[in-house]
């Protein structure tokens, strides 16, 4: 505690046991006879002036477990000539040198061989003029920020450290200008193998869904909770571990899609609190293909084995907290046990199940196979895929050719197996330690293929009620057909939550999350589901040349949608499959290219595509004498 041994002139030697995690401010203030201090592994926090003015100290060895060394704990210790900092990650300081008010010309700072650049750049530690490499090999490595570990060629085969990847309460601004709490991101390289005794990582797939804000893309990371952000491990060399533990964090009372980078027995998923109730289910692709909706999700038993790279759904409840923590251990004696350390491409086999309707065929629930963030554009896959938004409790479709969607560690998602494709390969180049999309030009295979295709125009529409939001997409592509194509389209999956609003397009009785089609007559049926009575807003995220007119048949209204103009309507709970129609005005062949003189000459009537029509018996928007006319 503060001032516990202050001004104790009889104290000449001190041993700090491993049970002590914190030494508070001024604890050994002005102990004038203190010559020797031995810190044990386990010390985490060392605060201001803890050893103020202890001038008899000549050497300080700080343990590898130390995370905070704030407020100059060794202020005025002028006798110190050697400081050995054994933490691989420099302990955070308040900006001041841990050894302040001392002539640092006479002091040498010794640090681990992997950490020289980190210490010379770190606040406080950069005050030391002389930094040399220590012979000490840390046995405990706690990674709570970005760290690049290059294994030395001369590393002993007996060296087996314990590595804990975790989060930090320290906030910093990253290279993308975002202010976030730091978390452990470890990249391992080198020609020698890194053999680890114990490794622990943190996986929190739901962290990307920002529970306090609503954003157009349907997800945003929650930067204000230090204990939910996932860590990232990227292995570019060779790494193994005797024991691995995943700390899995799930939000309470919501379904979460999860995957694991190794095989797991259900009984090896252990709640950290005994009061946690939970269930995990597998996906039956054959039942979905057969249209047996009630049999799609299968309850799993304690003896079932969850396969690496496959997807599952979890639901949990913990009465004392908003989220639940689990310890997850890999299945012993499994060939996939060390897959978490894979430095190569990963391939996931896809199951094929024929169906009467193509939109039900061969849906597979798979997952990010790496213990790091992954750029979906690097998958050997160019068809749409479906993710579960655990905040909105709905499905959202993305296309690697159009979207820079970043998969979280432990995140599962749906893909529909295309014809002739038996597997998906995750290229190792897609691995990354952060959650932001990289800027690139045709590096990813899906993006390159899209660039070589016909011109594709994308329209994203959202339906919003209060803080809940859902999205559908229309893509115009002359190479597409009006029929459902697994390589281009994505069926709309209904949410399991009855109160969640949903939006989709409709064609030939099929509901689409992504509807890629030729322009044809420029009309697309739009369906909505309103889970509760209330007000709803339909919005368009961008305008791409075409004008988008939303027709509300119930209200006999037409509204031009744009970035600045949405449409709000009231509705009772229920489905509305015939109420809305989207009219797309193709300006390349539409109104602007019609010869106005010809129109005026015979009082002709044209539709929005510039095609002459014989009558206006149907409701819609028409052009007469160069002016738009609405027929209600």
Where are the regions a protein language model picked out?
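Surface-exposed repetitive/solenoidal architectures
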Residues: 29, 115-159, 248-251, 259-262, ...
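Structural signature of tandem-repeat unit edges
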Residues: 8-22, 32-45, 54-68, 77-92, ...
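Extracellular, surface-exposed repeat/solenoid domains
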Residues: 81-120, 522, 541, 547-553
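Extracellular beta-strand-rich, repetitive "passenger/adhesive" scaffolds
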Residues: 3-11, 26-34, 49-57, 72-79, ...
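Compositionally biased Ser/Thr/Gly- and acidic/asparagine-rich
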Residues: 257, 265, 292-307, 311-611, ...
């Amino acid at each position: 505690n503060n001032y516990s041994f202050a001004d104790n002139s009889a104290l000449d030697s001190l041993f700090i046991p491993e049970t002590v995690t914190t030494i508070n401010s001024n604890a050994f203030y002005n102990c004038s006879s203190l010559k020797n201090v031995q810190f044990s592994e386990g010390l985490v926090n060392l605060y201001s002036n803890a050893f103020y003015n202890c001038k008899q100290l000549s050497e300080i060895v700080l343990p590898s477990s130390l995370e905070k060394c704030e407020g100059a704990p060794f202020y005025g210790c002028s006798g110190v000539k050697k400081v050995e900092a054994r933490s691989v990650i420099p302990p955070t300081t308040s900006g001041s040198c841990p050894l302040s008010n001392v002539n640092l010309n006479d002091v040498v700072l010794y640090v681990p061989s992997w950490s020289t650049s980190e210490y010379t750049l770190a606040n406080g530690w950069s005050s030391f003029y002389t930094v040399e490499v220590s012979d000490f090999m840390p046995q405990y490595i706690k990674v709570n920020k970005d760290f690049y570990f290059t294994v030395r060629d001369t590393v002993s085969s007996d060296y087996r450290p314990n590595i804990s990847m975790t989060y930090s309460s320290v906030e910093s601004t990253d290279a993308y200008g975002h202010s976030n709490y730091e978390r452990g991101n470890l990249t391992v390289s080198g020609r020698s193998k890194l053999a680890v005794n114990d490794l622990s990582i943190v996986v929190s797939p739901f962290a990307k869904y920002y529970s306090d804000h609503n954003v157009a893309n349907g997800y945003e990371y929650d930067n204000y909770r230090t204990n939910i952000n996932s860590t990232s491990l990227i292995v570019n060399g060779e790494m193994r571990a005797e024991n691995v533990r995943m700390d899995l964090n799930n939000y309470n009372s919501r379904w979460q899609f999860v995957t694991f980078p190794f095989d797991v027995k259900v009984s090896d998923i252990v709640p950290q609190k005994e009061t946690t109730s939970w269930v995990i289910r597998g996906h039956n692709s054959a039942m979905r293909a057969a249209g047996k909706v009630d049999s799609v999700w299968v309850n799993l038993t304690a003896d079932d084995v969850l396969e690496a790279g496959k997807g599952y759904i979890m639901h949990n409840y913990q009465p004392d907290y908003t989220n639940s923590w689990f310890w997850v251990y890999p299945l012993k004696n499994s060939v996939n046990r060390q897959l978490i350390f894979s430095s190569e491409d990963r391939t996931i086999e896809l199951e094929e199940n024929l169906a009467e309707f193509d939109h039900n065929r061969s849906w597979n629930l798979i997952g990010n196979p790496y213990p790091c963030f992954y750029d979906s554009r690097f998958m050997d896959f160019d068809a749409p895929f479906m993710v579960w938004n655990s905040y909105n409790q709905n499905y959202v479709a993305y296309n690697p050719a159009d979207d820079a969607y970043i998969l979280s560690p432990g995140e599962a998602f749906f893909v529909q197996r295309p014809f002739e494709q038996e597997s998906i390969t995750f290229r190792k180049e897609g691995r990354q330690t952060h959650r932001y999309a990289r800027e690139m030009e045709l590096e990813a295979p899906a993006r390159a293929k899209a660039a070589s295709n016909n011109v594709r125009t994308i329209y994203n529409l959202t339906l919003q009620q209060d803080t809940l939001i859902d999205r559908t997409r229309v893509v115009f592509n002359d190479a597409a057909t009006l029929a459902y194509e697994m390589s281009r389209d994505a069926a709309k999956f209904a949410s399991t939550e009855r109160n969640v609003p949903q939006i989709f397009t409709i064609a030939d009785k099929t509901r689409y999350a992504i509807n890629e089609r030729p322009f044809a007559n420029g009309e697309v049926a739009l369906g909505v589901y309103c889970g509760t009575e209330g007000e709803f807003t339909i919005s368009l995220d961008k305008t791409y040349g075409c004008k988008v007119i939303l027709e509300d048949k119930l209200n006999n209204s037409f509204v031009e949608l744009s970035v600045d103009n949405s449409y709000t309507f009231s509705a009772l709970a229920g489905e509305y499959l015939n109420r809305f129609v989207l009219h797309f005005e193709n300006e390349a062949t539409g109104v602007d290219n019609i010869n106005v003189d010809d129109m005026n000459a015979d009082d002709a009537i044209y539709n929005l595509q510039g095609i002459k029509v014989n009558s206006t018996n149907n409701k819609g928007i028409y052009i007469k004498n160069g002016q738009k006319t609405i027929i209600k």
